[in-house]
Amino acid sequence: METIKTIAIINDPKVTLGSLSNSDIEEKYAWDVDWESLSEHHEYIILGGHMGAYEIETYPYLLKEKEWLNKVINNGTKVFGICLGAQLIADSMGGTAFLSEEIEFGFKELEFHKETEIFSGLKNSKVFLWHRDTFTLPPSAELIASTKYPQIFTIRNSIAVQFHPEVTETLFKDWYDSDISRKELVDYDVSSTLNYLITNACLLYTSPSPRD
């Protein structure tokens, strides 16, 4: 019987596993992976990136990634998509990723539309957002939480989150220092807020899938 592994798909070298890092998680780069070799029996984390899910001419590997996501999600594989990963899941399953009217950046509370044990630890807390793109939900998806835009949805055995549960203080500082225009938007105690998020991110990652 094949051993189930967790494989992280990295779409951007600056966006890593962060708080979800684990020696048992195998990492693969989206632009260099043989999609046909990836077993549907494994579990996958699809990480974020600076590009849009629709930028397939500039990043042609995204088209192959979306085709693969459609196949494995429809076959019941467990996938956890983060930010760009959520947009790719939405786009691959019948939704549409697109450039939104505004940038969502900083720490914001979510509005929950459904009670779920998996996400209960995120209620009344702030999650870290950093994106300009958003998406429409696939027809078979279930919206769990949102801001003005969708933030958490489930589809078959997969979970997609638009925010960054993987963010650590180091990752935050790397992203923050690379874009001075964002600095005036953040006035929170970064360290204490991120510690709370990291705890809940790890709980989210180790929770059963929505259909278990």
Predicted features by range, described:
Residues 5-24:
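Short, charged N-terminal beta->alpha structural module
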Residues 156, 162, 167-193:
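C-terminal helical/coil "lid" or tail adjacent to the Rossmann-like core of SAM-dependent
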